[in-house]
């Protein structure tokens, strides 16, 4: 379960780099939205993974 949390965290970091790097206005907005979505998913899976132990 923590493996999924790590995967979501890496995806969130990639989305942040693309979103906050100033690549394109449309892509940046999409990346910012994805960043927050994946951060929430990361936190949920992290909590669930810790709760299972």
Curated annotation (Swiss-Prot):
> What InterPro entries does UniProt report for this protein, alphabetically?
DUF1328 (IPR009760)
Q: Which Pfam families match?
A: DUF1328 (PF07043)
Keyword ATP-binding in annotation? no
Bilayer topology annotation: Multi-pass membrane protein
The entry's keywords: Cell membrane, Membrane, Transmembrane, Transmembrane helix
What stretches pass through the bilayer? 5-25, 30-50
> What coarse category fits the chief subcellular location reported for this protein?
membrane
Q: Where found, per UniProt?
A: Cell membrane
User: What's any one GO cellular component for it?
Assistant: plasma membrane
DNA-binding among the record's keywords? no
**Listed HAMAP family:** UPF0391
Similarity remark:
Belongs to the UPF0391 family.
Its protein name is UPF0391 membrane protein BPSS2216
Q: Which organism is it from?
A: Burkholderia pseudomallei (strain K96243)
